[in-house]
């Protein structure tokens, strides 16, 4: 089969608003040795029924796009009371840390770090909606093969099993 190679910088910046179409289906073909899992979408997984999703829900991971900025900012501002305690290095006012410029800086930092194979930043999407982010970071290549994983999810999906499913998909 034919394997498409995407330029990660173009996908995350998405100047023409078409990048989301490239992630409608999971990637196929051999994984890149330096960038396994990025920029790719995962297959959909079915979340079990819960109080949040009585019939369950479909979830997947995909790369961050410029167009995710509005949802990222809105959800993180709404959930300041949950997120601030676990982000102790945040020194500026919460609204300023989640401005349009802050989103752009965040996206550019992750894009650069992903291109250098140091992180794998992905959006958590449930039923086609942005609900959070999961990131593998400080990726160590070679014999050590180590990293950390971090995530946050919007309060609207807390209790639905999203974080364990997202972290399992991210490390898989």
Question: What residues fall within each predicted segment?
Answer:
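GNAT-family acyltransferases
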Residues: 1, 5-156
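Conserved acetyl-CoA-binding loop-helix of GNAT-fold acetyltransferases
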Residues: 152, 159-172
């Amino acid at each position: 089969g034919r394997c498409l190679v995407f330029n990660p910088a173009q996908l995350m910046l998405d100047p023409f608003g078409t990048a989301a179409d490239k992630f409608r289906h999971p990637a196929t073909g051999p994984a890149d040795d330096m960038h396994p899992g990025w920029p790719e979408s995962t297959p959909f997984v079915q979340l079990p029924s819960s109080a949040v999703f009585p019939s369950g829900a479909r979830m997947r991971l995909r790369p961050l796009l410029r167009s995710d900025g509005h949802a990222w900012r809105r959800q993180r501002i709404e959930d300041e009371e949950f997120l601030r305690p676990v982000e102790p290095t945040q020194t500026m006012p919460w609204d300023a840390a989640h401005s349009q410029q802050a989103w752009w800086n965040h996206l550019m930092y992750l894009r650069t770090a992903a291109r250098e194979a140091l992180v794998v930043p992905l959006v958590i999407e449930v039923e086609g909606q942005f609900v959070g982010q999961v990131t593998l970071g400080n990726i160590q290549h070679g014999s050590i093969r180590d990293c950390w994983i971090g995530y946050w999810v919007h309060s609207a999906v807390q209790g639905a099993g999203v974080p364990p499913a997202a972290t399992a998909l991210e490390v898989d």
